[in-house]
Amino acid sequence: MSRVNPADLNLTDRVVHISRVAKVVKGGRRFSFSALIVVGDGCGYVGYGLGKANEVPEAIRKGVEQAKKNLIKVPVNQNQTIPFEIEGKFGAGRLLMKPASAGTGVIAGGAARAIFEAAGINNILSKCLGSNNPHNVVKAAFAGLQRLKSPEELAARRGITE
């Protein structure tokens, strides 16, 4: 898979989850933050990143930088949905994604909704099965979306021409 140049895309970023973590040291607790970020151009390109820092804005900035390095292309058809049903898995998290007819909207939970909207998928049905941890849901969604191929790609792979 070829690497995508983020400078060529008009990317918008979205914070999926921010968590405060504590490291217990001799003098007490030292707090830092981790931010899970999703970036996308609304036309099929989407990526996610995890940034960690002592301050929230710095964690978000680091997450955006990492997300720009993890961009993938998602095949979106003319109904602004995915071509076929697929399930993504990561750890204990599973995300079932089904194509929806035009006008349905994004039927998804928080973490999955952010990904679909960033990718420009406006009609989709999804269900989180197993873990609802935002990290697992995001990674499961990406695992499923990476496996998606457009109908043209599948036809070419199978040697079918119309």
Swiss-Prot record:
Keywords: Ribonucleoprotein, Ribosomal protein, RNA-binding, rRNA-binding. GO terms for cellular component: small ribosomal subunit. Belongs to the universal ribosomal protein uS5 family. One of its GO terms (molecular function) is structural constituent of ribosome. With S4 and S12 plays an important role in translational accuracy. Part of the 30S ribosomal subunit. Contacts proteins S4 and S8. Signal peptide: none annotated. It comes from the Bacteria. The N-terminal domain interacts with the head of the 30S subunit; the C-terminal domain interacts with the body and contacts protein S4. The interaction surface between S4 and S5 is involved in control of translational fidelity. GO terms for biological process: translation. Gene3D superfamilies: 3.30.160.20, 3.30.230.10. This is Small ribosomal subunit protein uS5. HAMAP family: Ribosomal_uS5_B. Residues 11-74 form the S5 DRBM domain. InterPro entries: Ribosomal_Su5_D2-typ_SF, Ribosomal_uS5, Ribosomal_uS5_bac-type, Ribosomal_uS5_C, Ribosomal_uS5_N, Ribosomal_uS5_N_CS, Ribsml_uS5_D2-typ_fold_subgr.
